[in-house]
Amino acid sequence: LGDVYKRQTQQGMEGKRKLTAKDAITAGALGAVCIAIRFIFMLVGGISPYVWFATHFIDAILIGPVFMLLVAKIRKNGPFLITSLVTGLILVSATWMFPITGLVGGILCELCLKAGQFRKKGWLVLGFFCFNLGFIGDFLPLWLTKESYLEYAAQMMDPGYMTTMEGLLTWPVFGIIVLSILVGSILGALLGMKLMRKHFVKAGLAQ
Protein backbone atom coordinates (compact mmCIF):
# COMPACT_ATOMS: atom_id res chain seq x y z
CA LEU A 1 0.00 0.00 0.00
CA GLY A 2 2.85 2.33 0.84
CA ASP A 3 4.50 1.70 -2.53
CA VAL A 4 1.23 2.39 -4.34
CA TYR A 5 0.78 5.67 -2.48
CA LYS A 6 4.36 6.65 -3.24
CA ARG A 7 3.92 5.94 -6.95
CA GLN A 8 0.66 7.89 -7.05
CA THR A 9 2.31 10.82 -5.29
CA GLN A 10 5.23 10.79 -7.71
CA GLN A 11 2.85 10.62 -10.67
CA GLY A 12 0.89 13.54 -9.26
CA MET A 13 4.04 15.61 -8.83
CA GLU A 14 5.17 14.76 -12.36
CA GLY A 15 1.76 15.81 -13.65
CA LYS A 16 2.04 19.12 -11.88
CA ARG A 17 5.45 19.71 -13.44
CA LYS A 18 4.18 19.10 -16.97
CA LEU A 19 2.81 21.96 -19.05
CA THR A 20 -0.94 21.75 -19.55
CA ALA A 21 -2.99 23.20 -22.41
CA LYS A 22 -3.97 26.05 -20.10
CA ASP A 23 -0.30 26.71 -19.32
CA ALA A 24 0.50 26.79 -23.03
CA ILE A 25 -2.31 29.27 -23.71
CA THR A 26 -1.15 31.49 -20.85
CA ALA A 27 2.44 31.34 -22.05
CA GLY A 28 1.32 32.09 -25.59
CA ALA A 29 -0.75 35.11 -24.56
CA LEU A 30 1.93 36.61 -22.35
CA GLY A 31 4.62 35.65 -24.85
CA ALA A 32 2.73 37.59 -27.51
CA VAL A 33 3.05 40.67 -25.30
CA CYS A 34 6.83 40.20 -25.18
CA ILE A 35 6.99 39.80 -28.95
CA ALA A 36 4.82 42.89 -29.53
CA ILE A 37 6.96 45.02 -27.22
CA ARG A 38 10.18 43.88 -28.90
CA PHE A 39 8.77 44.45 -32.38
CA ILE A 40 7.56 47.97 -31.52
CA PHE A 41 10.96 48.94 -30.14
CA MET A 42 12.70 47.56 -33.21
CA LEU A 43 10.61 50.01 -35.25
CA VAL A 44 11.24 52.87 -32.81
CA GLY A 45 14.96 52.18 -33.17
CA GLY A 46 14.74 53.68 -36.66
CA ILE A 47 14.72 57.13 -35.07
CA SER A 48 18.37 56.97 -34.09
CA PRO A 49 21.07 54.35 -33.43
CA TYR A 50 21.24 55.63 -29.85
CA VAL A 51 17.53 54.92 -29.43
CA TRP A 52 17.86 51.49 -31.05
CA PHE A 53 20.75 50.46 -28.82
CA ALA A 54 18.74 51.56 -25.75
CA THR A 55 15.63 49.58 -26.65
CA HIS A 56 16.69 46.37 -24.90
CA PHE A 57 17.09 48.34 -21.66
CA ILE A 58 13.59 49.80 -21.99
CA ASP A 59 11.78 46.64 -23.06
CA ALA A 60 13.42 44.69 -20.21
CA ILE A 61 11.71 47.06 -17.78
CA LEU A 62 8.35 46.77 -19.54
CA ILE A 63 8.49 42.98 -19.90
CA GLY A 64 9.39 42.53 -16.21
CA PRO A 65 5.80 42.43 -14.90
CA VAL A 66 4.77 40.05 -17.72
CA PHE A 67 7.67 37.74 -16.93
CA MET A 68 6.95 37.66 -13.20
CA LEU A 69 3.24 37.06 -13.78
CA LEU A 70 4.04 34.12 -16.03
CA VAL A 71 6.42 32.66 -13.43
CA ALA A 72 3.80 33.02 -10.69
CA LYS A 73 0.97 31.49 -12.71
CA ILE A 74 2.81 28.48 -14.13
CA ARG A 75 5.92 27.71 -12.03
CA LYS A 76 7.03 25.07 -14.53
CA ASN A 77 9.88 24.77 -16.99
CA GLY A 78 9.09 25.34 -20.64
CA PRO A 79 7.14 28.57 -21.24
CA PHE A 80 10.15 30.89 -21.43
CA LEU A 81 12.10 28.60 -23.72
CA ILE A 82 9.05 28.37 -25.97
CA THR A 83 8.54 32.15 -25.89
CA SER A 84 12.21 32.85 -26.64
CA LEU A 85 12.35 30.40 -29.52
CA VAL A 86 9.03 31.50 -31.05
CA THR A 87 10.09 35.15 -30.78
CA GLY A 88 13.34 34.34 -32.55
CA LEU A 89 11.53 32.48 -35.33
CA ILE A 90 8.99 35.27 -35.82
CA LEU A 91 11.71 37.93 -35.98
CA VAL A 92 14.13 35.80 -38.01
CA SER A 93 13.58 38.13 -40.98
CA ALA A 94 15.68 40.70 -39.10
CA THR A 95 18.59 38.27 -38.72
CA TRP A 96 19.16 34.51 -38.63
CA MET A 97 20.95 34.96 -35.30
CA PHE A 98 17.69 35.73 -33.49
CA PRO A 99 16.52 32.09 -33.10
CA ILE A 100 19.99 31.01 -31.93
CA THR A 101 20.35 33.66 -29.22
CA GLY A 102 16.70 33.17 -28.28
CA LEU A 103 17.26 29.43 -27.83
CA VAL A 104 20.38 29.93 -25.71
CA GLY A 105 18.76 32.68 -23.62
CA GLY A 106 15.62 30.60 -23.13
CA ILE A 107 17.55 27.53 -21.96
CA LEU A 108 19.67 29.55 -19.52
CA CYS A 109 16.53 31.28 -18.23
CA GLU A 110 14.80 27.96 -17.58
CA LEU A 111 17.87 26.57 -15.78
CA CYS A 112 18.04 29.64 -13.52
CA LEU A 113 14.34 29.47 -12.67
CA LYS A 114 14.59 25.77 -11.86
CA ALA A 115 17.67 26.36 -9.70
CA GLY A 116 15.72 28.95 -7.72
CA GLN A 117 12.59 26.76 -7.58
CA PHE A 118 10.68 29.58 -9.32
CA ARG A 119 10.67 31.56 -6.06
CA LYS A 120 14.14 32.81 -5.09
CA LYS A 121 14.57 36.45 -6.08
CA GLY A 122 18.22 36.22 -7.09
CA TRP A 123 17.58 33.37 -9.49
CA LEU A 124 14.45 35.06 -10.83
CA VAL A 125 16.44 38.19 -11.68
CA LEU A 126 19.27 36.17 -13.24
CA GLY A 127 16.79 34.11 -15.24
CA PHE A 128 15.07 37.27 -16.46
CA PHE A 129 18.45 38.71 -17.50
CA CYS A 130 19.20 35.57 -19.54
CA PHE A 131 15.73 35.79 -21.09
CA ASN A 132 16.33 39.40 -22.17
CA LEU A 133 19.87 38.70 -23.31
CA GLY A 134 18.41 36.17 -25.70
CA PHE A 135 16.90 39.05 -27.67
CA ILE A 136 20.33 40.52 -28.44
CA GLY A 137 20.41 38.57 -31.68
CA ASP A 138 19.22 41.64 -33.59
CA PHE A 139 22.43 43.48 -32.62
CA LEU A 140 25.02 40.73 -33.12
CA PRO A 141 25.29 41.02 -36.93
CA LEU A 142 26.45 44.63 -36.50
CA TRP A 143 29.54 43.41 -34.66
CA LEU A 144 30.10 39.92 -36.06
CA THR A 145 29.42 40.73 -39.73
CA LYS A 146 30.01 44.46 -39.59
CA GLU A 147 31.13 45.19 -43.16
CA SER A 148 28.47 43.14 -44.95
CA TYR A 149 25.73 44.41 -42.62
CA LEU A 150 26.66 48.07 -43.14
CA GLU A 151 26.84 47.57 -46.90
CA TYR A 152 23.37 46.01 -46.91
CA ALA A 153 21.84 48.55 -44.49
CA ALA A 154 23.25 51.51 -46.43
CA GLN A 155 20.86 50.69 -49.28
CA MET A 156 17.83 51.39 -47.08
CA MET A 157 18.90 53.77 -44.30
CA ASP A 158 19.68 57.46 -44.15
CA PRO A 159 23.41 58.26 -44.61
CA GLY A 160 23.45 60.27 -41.38
CA TYR A 161 21.95 57.34 -39.48
CA MET A 162 24.56 55.01 -40.96
CA THR A 163 27.45 57.32 -40.08
CA THR A 164 26.30 57.56 -36.47
CA MET A 165 25.78 53.82 -36.18
CA GLU A 166 29.14 52.96 -37.70
CA GLY A 167 30.84 55.14 -35.09
CA LEU A 168 29.10 53.19 -32.33
CA LEU A 169 30.11 49.73 -33.52
CA THR A 170 32.91 49.14 -31.03
CA TRP A 171 33.16 46.33 -28.49
CA PRO A 172 33.09 48.73 -25.51
CA VAL A 173 29.70 49.96 -26.77
CA PHE A 174 28.54 46.35 -27.07
CA GLY A 175 29.61 45.83 -23.45
CA ILE A 176 27.57 48.88 -22.44
CA ILE A 177 24.53 47.42 -24.21
CA VAL A 178 24.89 44.13 -22.31
CA LEU A 179 25.28 46.09 -19.06
CA SER A 180 22.16 48.12 -19.88
CA ILE A 181 20.24 44.87 -20.39
CA LEU A 182 21.40 43.71 -16.96
CA VAL A 183 20.29 46.97 -15.32
CA GLY A 184 16.98 46.93 -17.22
CA SER A 185 16.41 43.32 -16.18
CA ILE A 186 16.99 44.14 -12.52
CA LEU A 187 14.61 47.12 -12.68
CA GLY A 188 12.02 45.15 -14.65
CA ALA A 189 12.20 42.20 -12.27
CA LEU A 190 11.83 44.44 -9.22
CA LEU A 191 8.90 46.24 -10.86
CA GLY A 192 7.29 42.90 -11.64
CA MET A 193 7.74 41.68 -8.06
CA LYS A 194 6.26 44.91 -6.69
CA LEU A 195 3.23 44.72 -8.96
CA MET A 196 2.89 41.05 -8.09
CA ARG A 197 2.49 41.84 -4.40
CA LYS A 198 0.39 44.95 -4.89
CA HIS A 199 -1.98 44.13 -7.74
CA PHE A 200 -1.67 40.68 -9.31
CA VAL A 201 -2.32 38.72 -6.11
CA LYS A 202 -5.31 40.91 -5.17
CA ALA A 203 -6.76 40.52 -8.65
CA GLY A 204 -6.38 36.75 -8.43
CA LEU A 205 -3.92 36.67 -11.34
CA ALA A 206 -1.17 35.15 -9.20
CA GLN A 207 -0.75 33.34 -5.92
Give the ranges of each region predicted by the language model.
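Short, small-residue-biased leader/transition segments that mark boundaries at the very start
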Residues: 1-5
